[in-house]
Amino acid sequence: RWQRHGLNVQISETAWGQGAPLAAIEKALNADKAQQIKAVLATHNETATGVKSDIAGIRRALDAAGHPAMLFVDGVSSIASMPFDFAGWGVDIAVAGSQKGFMLPAGLAILGVSPKALAAMETARLPRTYFDFKDMLSAYARGGYPYTPAVGLIAGLAHSIDLLETEGLDNVYARHHRLAEGVRRAVFAWGMTPYAASADLYSDTVTAVKVPEGCDGTALVQLAASKYGMAFGVGLGEVA
């Protein structure tokens, strides 16, 4: 989708089941002598594979290369459920959604933005139509929105945040980890394995399961739903 905007996109590939390729990212940054790379984009927690990536490691790669590129992170399936240190990791834009850790229906995009990213916005030349921080900031200053807001979801978000703060984020993270670890132990007991290549990559919000050769994953999902009333998602992309 970035290429649809006419942007020059350099993709650092990694095998499915692995996290963001830190060495490849640092190599690309070091090779950019003219410092033309504007931003590094990464997904913190990949839903299709159940893999979390080392965002702090990407920040270290940027710092080691002395590169001024910004760091944009998709945190849709991790923020409010797993530790996410926006300031400590030097993230410039983080994107979350109402439908994951904030426990609401889909419909809200929740963004965090750094002063550096806001400053870059002032000189950005790419046309924006659907979303523009300038529109948002101008409307917020007047106590409103540049569109008709989803009032019900916004009210629900306020309640969700109250719940998260009442429980305490450390307790929220511990709860998700405990439940995820229980799921992973069950997966191993069934003779299957998580799709993530190693334990340090395990997500605490989604576990993608690798079924044995000859096992029909879709049939397994259907059996769990019909016999046990349990809902599992089918694979996405290359793990479908």
Model-based region annotation:
Residues 11-12, 41-42, 71-75, 94-97, ...:
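General beta-strand structural signal in soluble alpha/beta enzymes
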Residues 16-19, 46-50, 79, 102, ...:
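Short, small-residue-enriched loops and turns at beta-alpha junctions
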Residues 20-78:
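Active-site phosphate-binding strand-loop segment of PLP-dependent enzymes
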Residues 87-99:
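Conserved active-site segment immediately N-terminal to the catalytic lysine
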Residues 99-185, 189:
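Active-site C-terminal subdomain of aminotransferase-like
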Residues 188, 192-240:
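Conserved C-terminal alpha-helix-loop-beta "cap" of PLP-dependent enzymes
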